[in-house]
Amino acid sequence: MKNKILRSVLMVLIWTFGSLTMLSAQGSYSNFNDLTDRLNQLNSNYGDLVSLESLDETADGREIWVLTIGSGDIENHPAVAVVGGAKGSHIFGSELALTFAEKLLARSNTDEVSELLETTTFYVFPRLNPDATEHYFADLKYERDVNTISTNEDRDDAFDEDPFEDLNGDNLITMMRVEDETGKWKMLEEDNRLMTQADITKGEQGNYHVFTEGMDNDKDGAFNEDGEGGVNINKNFTFDYPYFEPGAGENMASQIETRAILDFLFEEASNVFSVVTFGPANNLSSPLRFNRGAVSQRVITGWYEEDVAVNSLVSEAYNEITNLDYAPANSGQQGDLFQWAYFHYGRFSFSTPGWAVPEVMDEEGNSQKFESTDAKFLVWAEQQGMDAFVDWQEVNHPDFPNKTVEVGGIKPYVSFNPPYSAVDSLAESHTDFLIKLAGMKPNVQLVNFETEEAGRNLTRISVDVHNSGILPTAARLGERTNWVKEVILKLELSGNLELVSGDVLETIESIEGDGSLTQTWLVRGNGSFTISAGAPNTGISTIEQTIR
């Protein structure tokens, strides 16, 4: 017995050390090979708690991974889907999803997490758009959100004929400004390194044109409008799909990456009660507001009031744990995963960028106010000793003879991806939040069970179907769709038991948090019976009894 206990302790230490080694050895954001190695190590170290599956391969042959975490009957345990990397340039979201999985499993030897994983499943999609994200590691850096599928963005029947060019030779694609009296742009007064559009209503006048760095290769008057690839996966989902918009694809759900997650969630993950996206949308730092007009239309475009209340509750928990209440609100964009998860998948959908530029203090310790978020970022970056800006440099440009053309601007990626040194602490707090969210899950229990003799060989059976969770068993919008399974209450009789009154099967659309409903049946005879209640996204509770 002592040897068995010792072996168990050693195993816990090995697993924990392995996870800590993964975290401490990592010194920079993970490219696809690093990400795959870390996932395989989790699969090897925690084989009884995880399974690693490739949903498909991208155009460049990269796997679209999903890591399932949990124990026992995982398909019938309420689940949280955690998604990173839908926006290709937001590499922090991908890193956050992966590091969450590592930190959660590193805690699996604690009572809190061990018990959680016995009743809750996590589906982690660490990098939904790996081909786009991989460009972060390319020699020539530019913010890329699209995959590598060739597209004809300018509809001229030529593909990828007008890409970016590195005009100043720094291996970064930034911005280009051209001095011209007819321009619509001017220097920002708050920080003259930055450019802003002139506001004619305020009497402002522009004196620059602003483009992304490059040349007009196809001579159509537009710059870099048809570069390499592709489709932005975070604009390719089915809700509010932006037809004909650059990067959205030829049609909704047209991409391997999009279909991979849609097929998995619809076909294999009916137990999901919430989707958490690490991306640009943000309804966690600031919850959404109820808009009665948006829910009164034939096509609903806003959250129901009951669901907004849930959003506020979860947001309060998020801010208490992460202290990110200062992060800007963002209700999402057309065709994104965040909105799809609520409006078309019918689940509670939460999203956060996971990081935002903190408050900037002056020399006296007072918070500085900024009109421009970019100006705020540059002051903060300088305080951190970051090299975040390419100074404007004059270049010769064949498309603008006799004009002053300069290249410069904020470096790619740095304004919305934190320094890697911040990842560990941010992942720690977001792991705490996801554990908290999982603990709020709907949880159907059969309670207050009673049998009572009713005379003449009759027995009255009564039970309360109770949702002991904080969240309702379904979002209000989920009640309107066919994609969220309703709670099923079922009575099964055996022996010579005969049902006199009541229904052997009932469906319940939703039970609010800490809510209950009572069900009674009248049966004749004796024998055994089974009562079960629940759904994959609420857990299933069962009572077995015999009437003699």
Tell me the role of every PLM-derived stretch.
Residues G527-P536:
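Short, aromatic- and glycine-rich surface loops/edge beta-strands on solvent-exposed regions
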Residues L497-N526:
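Intrinsically disordered, low-complexity Pro/Gly/Ser/Thr-rich segments with frequent PxxP/GP/PP motifs
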Residues S51-L52, E63, V83, E95, ...:
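Metallocarboxypeptidase
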